[in-house]
Amino acid sequence: MSENRNEGSSQAAKANSDTQTPSHFKVTHPRLRDQLKKKSSKKKGFKFVQEKMLKFQHVIRNQFLQQISQQMQCVPPGDQQCTQTSRKRKKMGYLLSQMVNFLWSNTVKKLKFKVPLPCLDSRCGIKVGHQTLSPWQTGQSRPSLGGFEAALASCTLSKRGAGIYESYHLSFQSYEAYQADKYHKDKNPSGYINLSTSENKLCLDLITARLTQSDMNLLDEAQLQYSDWKGQPFLREELASFLTHYCKAPTPLDPENVVVLNGCSSVFASLAMVLCDPGDALLIPTPCYNGFVFSSHLYSKIELIPVHLESQVPRSNLDSFQLTVDKLKLALTQAKKKAKKVKGLVLINPQNPLGDVYTQSSLQEYLVFAKTHKLHVIMDEIYMLSVFEPSVTFHSVLSIKDLPDPNMTHMIWGTSKDFGMSGIRFGVLYTHNKEVASAMKAFGYHHGVSGITQYKLCRLLQDKEWISKVYLPKNHSRLQKAYSYITKILKDLKIPFYNGGSGLFVWINLKAYLSPCTFDQEQILHQRFRDKKLLLSSGKSYMCIEPGWFRLVFAETHLHLQVAMDRFCHVLAEHKKHEK
């Protein structure tokens, strides 16, 4: 360990004598050093060091991401701009090494913290013991210090806590940057525009007006007290009526089969725990909603087994990304060969991120397959009222008169997407299985919805005339207009895209901009969009088997879309210029 420390220090010293430290760190580094000396003398211990270390790592990571992206844009290696970018990256690496060595030598060793000292290899990869971690790891949204960072976190967190910490930061780093620096036409014109998170911002005026009408303002004592953990009876009764109507159920749905929690992610994670044991698996067609990946690991500790769908199927009459029973059988067979215990099938309808809507016959085939293999079916229908293409018909699983296995079929819906109310945390499960409904009730203790929210939602869902005659027609019209605006630009740029006439997004093919077409290059392009303060979702995060796909959300105000697409076009134009 001492050899690594001396080598790192000598490299840092040499770098400082030959070059200047990047201007961003002229103040930051000395200040951190002085603070560390002062705090160390007061015996503040490891917690302070950890805090400063992680903060410093965050700054370093952002610099690495920007410079790696810039380096990839460079023309041949001998070019002056490319050389300067490479030098800046090395300076950053030396600075990180110097900081790590300082912390280790002055504080950490006194606490007998037995973790190998990280150092930097010649390519600025991080070495932890015998393991080398590239500054850009495939499939991750940021570089990671892997075992070293996990060891730092685990000094105060459990192993599970350290895993949650890492998983969260991998998943939400871009989102946190957006929350801290949002675009505003006047106040912050250079801020982030988020076309990554699927939110419907086209009808906020309609929803706000409806939620502030006088009938929404009742407040009684019952709303201020604990309620049935499944949800208030009046809300569950209204939800049963609402789903019967809009899902076209053949018979009235039972309020006792309704469970209300604070969001569809809570419903999915809780349902997975009820249906699966840790280590069990669920089949899911991919690309799929990436939130399921995060939720499945956070609580239930289950595995999602991808049923890969391809954009092009050679020598076949299948459509792009088409799910078939044969693909389900293949995925199930391969999982069993690996001794996986598959307990269910997750289907998203309308599909996210594709925007596809399953036909009634296809849906029936999937349900029969599940019954044959004794699998639960979890149907996520959160976009069921966001089908904006008139020629497309949505068929809810609750509309099927003779379900192959009602006891094993469970449907999830919420107001986040269809009503643009993602900030009002609400999700609903409808299941014909009384035992499942009873078990799910327990999760209301931790994931319940406030009484005031339940009352307002009940009043909103009761107003079917306003929903059917005012809200839905305007919402569909605005979605269609935004979709047309985005897809015209994509067509002009000759960018292929995919959407089945529903949802809040398009699935775009940027393979032509990746050379070579790899997930590494996909991540580089993803970072270049972020450098331009534009957030898109990369296909890798949706477990897509093919690199080059991105999800672009269009349910945004026209002004935001204009600025966002200007940035989008600029990034691609710059990329093309450097390719030449």
From Swiss-Prot:
Q: Spell out the PANTHER family in the cross-references.
A: BIFUNCTIONAL ASPARTATE AMINOTRANSFERASE AND GLUTAMATE/ASPARTATE-PREPHENATE AMINOTRANSFERASE-RELATED (PTHR43795), INACTIVE 1-AMINOCYCLOPROPANE-1-CARBOXYLATE SYNTHASE-LIKE PROTEIN 2-RELATED (PTHR43795:SF1)
Q: Give the start-end ranges of region Disordered.
A: 1-43
Q: Which gene encodes it?
A: Accsl
UniProt keyword list? Pyridoxal phosphate
Which family is it part of? Belongs to the class-I pyridoxal-phosphate-dependent aminotransferase family.
The yes or no answer to whether the keyword Iron-sulfur is present is no
For the modification N6-(pyridoxal phosphate)lysine, the affected residues are 417
Q: Where is the composition biased (Polar residues)?
A: 7-23
Lineage, top-rank taxon, reads: Eukaryota
| The protein's name | Probable inactive 1-aminocyclopropane-1-carboxylate synthase-like protein 2
Which organism does this sequence originate in?
Mus musculus (Mouse)
